[in-house]
């Protein structure tokens, strides 16, 4: 998942406001043949059918996951049933590094969006590879870092974009500007 910067302009009391927001979309992570050959030697491959929820909050991970092919969605569900997608990952991504490294259970739901093949690298192998293999260590650090940026953008959006501003951006993005009547509202 990467972030694209989107700017939306709108009028508020004759003042032109320019607000920014971040939208997320899924892209494959860069592939690394050396890393993939290394990963083939560790753990087991699992295939999940489309729409299969294979991790739920409270589960203890036995290893770190590497997506060989497919796409996974990682999300939380609030007490009111609201779903918040943290990220959607595709080929070449790791996930589960944080709870595995901290030896804590996951707090997320993980679901295959399409048929997905993953390699699960057991905790012991994960620790050894982090200590002894630079390619593996750098790939894990890059995965952590990209996810940290995603979280930073989420925090930035919540901290600096009030609910009022987010609603204005939503309405502006749905306004039909092809039909304008003087001193009237846009159709949505």
Task: Cite the ranges covered by each PLM segment.
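A structural signal for well-ordered alpha-helical scaffolds and beta->alpha junctions
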Residues: 14, 28-32, 123, 137, ...
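Polybasic "coupling" helices that flank or enter modular domains
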Residues: 131-188
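Cyclic nucleotide-binding regulatory domains
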Residues: 52-114
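Cyclic-nucleotide recognition modules
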Residues: 86-145, 149
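Cyclic nucleotide-binding regulatory module and flanking cytosolic helices
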Residues: 2-50, 94-95, 99-100
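Short N-terminal helix-initiation segments at or just after the protein's N-terminus
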Residues: 1-17, 35-36, 52-62, 88, ...
């Amino acid at each position: 998942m990467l972030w694209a910067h989107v700017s939306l302009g709108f009028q508020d009391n004759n003042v032109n406001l320019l607000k920014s927001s971040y939208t997320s979309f899924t892209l494959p992570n860069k592939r690394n043949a050396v890393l993939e050959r290394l990963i083939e030697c560790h753990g087991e491959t699992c295939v999940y059918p489309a729409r299969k929820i294979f991790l739920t909050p409270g589960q203890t991970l036995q290893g770190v996951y590497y997506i060989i092919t497919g796409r996974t969605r990682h999300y939380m569900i609030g007490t009111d049933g609201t779903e918040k997608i943290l990220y959607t990952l595709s080929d070449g991504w790791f996930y589960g590094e944080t709870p595995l490294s901290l030896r804590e259970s996951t707090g997320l739901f993980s679901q295959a969006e399409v048929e997905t093949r993953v390699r699960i690298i057991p905790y012991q192998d994960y620790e050894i590879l982090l200590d002894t293999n630079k390619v593996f260590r750098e790939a894990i650090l890059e995965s952590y870092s990209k996810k940290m940026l995603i979280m930073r953008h989420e925090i930035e959006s919540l901290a600096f974009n009030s609910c009022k501003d987010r609603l204005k951006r939503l309405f502006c993005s749905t306004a039909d500007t092809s039909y304008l009547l003087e001193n009237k509202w846009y159709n949505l």
